[in-house]
Amino acid sequence: MNLILLMVIGFLIFIGTYMILSVNLIRIVIGISIYTHAGNLIIMSMGNYSKNKVEPLIGEGSQNFVDPLLQAIVLTAIVIGFAMTAFLLVLVYRTYRVTKEDEIDVLRGDDDDANE
């Protein structure tokens, strides 16, 4: 199971890197969002079931459990990732409305303007 999860995380990182390296701003935002999902999966994979972990307050008849701290961290990361994605989408939309362009190469401008 861990090997499958590791392969999924690697695939998400590959797709995120591919999207971030494109010139389209929307693809870059989607790539950053995919990176956050891969990071959340990495954190969740750290809290897998273990035979040595037992419920802390119940002595007899206890069962294996997953660390709730990692789940709280991932929930917080999901909210932060959603807010960041929403902010970046608004920023890209505003940039498109002002410049009528959505590619990074066009938005860089001319080097002659920077020298003057």
From Swiss-Prot:
NCBIfam families assigned: PRK12660.1
Protein name according to UniProt: Putative antiporter subunit mnhC2
Record bears the keyword Transmembrane: yes
Keyword Transmembrane helix attached: yes
Membrane-spanning ranges: 3-23, 28-48, 72-92
Keywords: Antiport, Cell membrane, Ion transport, Membrane, Transmembrane, Transmembrane helix, Transport
Subunit structure: May form a heterooligomeric complex that consists of seven subunits: mnhA2, mnhB2, mnhC2, mnhD2, mnhE2, mnhF2 and mnhG2.
GO annotations of cellular component type: plasma membrane
Any GO molecular function: antiporter activity
GO biological process, one term: monoatomic ion transport
Annotated PANTHER family: ANTIPORTER SUBUNIT MNHC2-RELATED
